[in-house]
Structure formats: structure tokens, C-alpha cells
Regions:
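Active-site-proximal, well-structured secondary-structure segments within enzyme catalytic domains
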Residues: 11, 15-16, 20-194, 254-303, ...
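Short connector loops/turns at beta-strand edges and beta->alpha or beta->beta junctions
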Residues: 29, 196-198, 227
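Short small-residue beta-strand/loop micro-motif enriched in glycine and branched aliphatics
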Residues: 41-42, 169, 199-203, 233
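Short pre-active-site segment immediately N-terminal to the catalytic Zn-binding motif
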Residues: 110, 196-215
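C-terminal, non-catalytic "cap/extension" segments appended to globular domains
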Residues: 95, 113, 117-130, 138-140, ...
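Short hydrophobic "helix-edge" motifs at membrane interfaces and signal-peptide entry regions
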Residues: 14-16, 206-207, 396-398
């Protein structure tokens, strides 16, 4: 079976990493990989993960109880939901509980309108001007080009390669093309995505989740450009500590959970009607369900990546370690033979540091809580955030950037509110972004 050959490859990778770490004086690869990160060490990480587990476990238990009760109404003999069926039951629950089908909002998110909305949102939030550029030579005719300005000062150039085609990478990513050097070289970057559309007559109707992904990736691009104005290329934004790099883009996601921001561009591709508030409310409530369970799942992946890089690779039982963590963090029934670790590609790029997604979610929500919910894009927080967090790039430690914007150490308050939003019957606050 393929997973067995992947096991050999993974064991060889872990062995080589351990050898390198020990040559450099570290006990494990995880100690080496975290030494110059915000988290500092595996010991500090384990302490932090305990805090996240404490915050998310109780609401995750409530989510699972509701989901199991719903499933048992349809299958009375069911005692535990299988890991293989979990996503199915979650989708059925959202449809029944919130009367929301993810397909119902797609007509309000044609690709061209979403692109305009993303650009307009970033422009207003960061006090910049993003202007289309014509006549630029690109690697494919479908690629569009924009220059980013601060007043009359050009900050950099971005390329959007947004639709699938033969031979193209199938993922969604941000690619820095040129690092900025103040006074000598402007930063350039590209989004390489696979969103619907791109063909004549195809409006490219997008799922809401795709709309959020677009803004997330655009957040990386803005970090690269705005943070690429420093004296040295090594101070570019993406050279900040690796366990901070997802925080700015995850923070930006939250703006597209606001009705005022969405309604500024979410118009029906045929009638031009604005996304109905009632449909948004159902979508928003459905979106809150499963957050805590999702965070427990992130803890599972974090624990696996950490254990794989701290336990001796020669005797490491991949299935046993994965199953032990699965049973610790997942309420679902384990499926023997799933071998998820054998296709866990983050073990290659992130190695022991998958925790980045968990840490940065907490920081991102703390950041977002500093914005006025009644005027998300128009208040002073956007420019202050740009100057304190994005513009410095890697000239300062990430922890200092966080403190400079928050005025304090980060905490879990906003994260806890985010986890519990599904149990809050209060109506959703909307900004005046329109």
C-alpha cells in the first residue's frame, strides 16, 4: 500500500531532521524549529496548547452533543459519529438547523464582483490605492496586474492568477516574486488561485468559503507589499517569525463575516439585488457552528506534528501516535486504517510547527477586536494596524509588533467570544461599510 512507502519516506525525513538538530546542539528537531519562533520551545507550546484545549473543549462537547442528537433522530441506533461521516452530519445539521445551503449564496458572489470587493476592502482598510495596470507582460493572458499606491508613492506591484487551467498548480497561495528594498527595488507578488470563472460566459459563482479564502490570500499579498519598504531584503514581511505569518491574513478573514462589508459587493449576478440580510443571517449562524470542534481538530494536527518531531524516529509508531491524539481531541469514532499522517503534507513544510494556525488564530481575533464593529473600515484602527503590524515587516520581533498594536500582551478573550458565538442569540452587529 502507498501509505507504507510514505511511512519510509517520513521516517527518513524525521531521522535526518533529528540528526541536523543534534549537530546544532538541540535535543530534538522541534527544539531547533521553535528556537527562533514566537513560541520559543516545545515546553512553552505544550503550556499554550493546554490553554487552547481548556477554552475549546467545553463548547466542542456542546457542539458534538447537538450533532449526535440530530444524527440519532435520523439513525436511532447511532451511538457515536464516525470520523468518516462527521463532515456529512455537520452539513446536514447546518441545513436543518439554520435552513442554509451553501449553494444558495453563490449567485451573489460572481468572481469579478468579489475581486472588486476584495480590492476595495483592502484599499479602504489600509488607506492605499490599488490601480489596474495594462500592457504588462505576464506568464499567461488571464493574469491581471495592479500597482499599489500610498497617495502618489508606488509601494509595489501585484499579479492575480486566479482561475484554473491545464498544467497550473491546483492550490491557493501567495508567491513573493521580488523582495522590496527601500529606495532601490519595489516588492512584487502574485496570488495563484483556482477560483471559478475565467472562461467566456462563466460568471464564476463562488462559495462563501472561497470568498473568505480570497481575502485571506490577499492579506498575505498586502503584508508582502506594505511590509516590503525597509532598508534590507532580509527585513521583508515574510521573513518575520514563521509562527506569526498567518496572523495578518487570518485577521483579514473576519472582515468578510460582516454584513456591511459583504453587502458592498455581494450583488446577484443577474438581478443586481444585494445579498438579503435574512440570508446572510442564516449563513452567518451556520458559519459559527463547528468552530470549537474545528479548533480541537487543529489541536489534534498540532499534537501529531509535535510528537512526530520529539519522539525518537527509529521506534516511532505513526499509527499509534496519531490514534492516541485522535482519541484525545476528537469525539468521533476512529476509523482503523485511515493513516491520515501518511498524507499530512504540512509535516513537510511546517514540520513540527503546525501550531502556527492555532497561535495565529488567537492573535488574529485579538487584532480584529480592536476595530469598531459599527465602522470596520472607516475607523482609525486600519491605518494604525498597517503602521504597527504590516509596515515594519521583519524589522522587529513579531511579539513586539503584536504588543505595539494591542498595547498589551495578547490574550484569549476574543478567541473565547468567537468560540461561543454560536450559543449567543444576539443579532449580528453590522458595520456601515456600504
Amino acid at each position: 500500500m502507498l501509505f507504507r512507502s510514505n511511512a519510509d519516506t517520513l521516517r527518513a525525513l524525521l531521522t535526518a531532521r533529528l540528526e541536523l538538530a543534534q549537530l546544532l546542539g538541540f535535543a530534538t528537531w522541534a527544539d531547533f524549529a521553535m528556537a527562533d519562533m514566537m513560541i520559543g520551545s516545545p515546553a512553552h507550546l505544550r503550556e499554550y496548547l493546554q490553554q487552547i484545549d481548556t477554552a475549546s473543549r467545553e463548547p466542542a462537547t456542546r457542539e458534538q452533543a447537538a450533532l449526535l442528537a440530530f444524527a440519532r433522530e435520523r439513525e436511532p441506533a447511532l451511538t457515536q459519529i464516525s470520523a468518516a461521516d462527521s463532515r456529512y452530519w455537520q452539513e446536514q445539521y447546518r441545513r436543518a438547523k439554520y435552513s442554509f445551503d451553501s449553494q444558495s449564496v453563490r449567485p451573489y458572489f460572481p468572481y469579478a464582483a468579489v475581486e472588486r470587493g476584495v480590492i476595495a476592502t483592502a484599499s479602504r482598510l489600509f488607506h492605499i490605492d490599488i490601480r489596474p495596470v495594462s500592457g504588462v507582460r505576464t506568464w499567461h493572458p488571464s493574469v491581471t496586474t495592479y500597482d499599489v499606491y500610498d497617495g502618489d508613492l508606488r509601494l509595489g506591484r501585484i499579479y492575480l492568477d486566479m482561475h484554473p487551467r491545464a498544467g497550473k498548480d491546483k492550490w491557493f497561495s501567495t508567491a513573493p516574486l521580488t523582495l522590496g528594498v527601500h529606495g532601490r527595488q519595489l516588492p512584487e507578488g502574485a496570488l495563484v488561485c483556482n477560483f471559478p470563472g475565467g472562461a467566456a460566459g462563466d460568471p464564476g459563482l463562488m462559495q462563501y468559503s472561497d470568498v473568505v479564502i480570497f481575502l485571506h490570500e490577499f492579506g498575505h499579498l498586502m503584508h508582502h507589499v506594505i511590509g516590503g519598504q525597509n532598508p534590507y531584503a532580509g527585513q521583508a514581511a515574510f521573513n518575520v517569525e514563521g509562527d506569526f505569518v498567518e496572523a495578518p491574513s487570518q485577521m483579514l478573514e473576519e472582515f468578510f463575516r460582516d454584513y456591511g462589508v459583504l453587502a458592498s459587493f455581494a450583488h446577484h449576478y443577474q438581478s443586481g439585488a444585494v445579498l438579503p440580510r435574512e440570508l446572510y443571517e442564516r449563513m452567518s449562524r451556520a458559519d459559527t457552528f463547528g468552530r470549537a470542534s474545528g479548533q480541537q481538530r487543529q489541536l489534534l494536527y498540532t499534537a501529531v506534528s509535535l510528537d512526530f518531531h520529539t519522539l525518537p524516529p527509529a521506534t516511532l509508531d505513526f499509527d499509534a501516535v496519531f490514534r492516541g491524539n485522535f482519541e484525545r481531541f476528537s469525539p468521533n469514532a476512529y476509523v482503523p486504517g485511515m493513516h491520515m499522517w501518511a498524507s499530512f503534507t504540512h509535516l513537510n513544510g511546517y514540520s513540527s510547527n503546525y501550531y502556527t494556525y492555532v497561535l495565529d488564530k488567537v492573535i488574529a481575533l485579538d487584532f480584529f477586536a480592536q476595530f469598531d464593529p459599527h465602522d470596520l473600515l472607516g475607523g482609525p484602527a486600519g491605518l494604525r494596524y498597517r503602521r504597527a503590524v504590516l509596515a515594519p515587516g521583519a524589522t522587529q520581533p513579531a511579539a513586539q509588533l503584536v504588543r505595539d498594536f494591542l498595547g498589551r500582551e495578547p490574550n484569549l478573550d476574543a478567541y473565547r467570544r468567537w468560540l461561543l458565538a454560536q450559543f449567543d442569540s444576539a443579532s449580528t452587529i453590522s458595520s456601515t461599510a456600504r
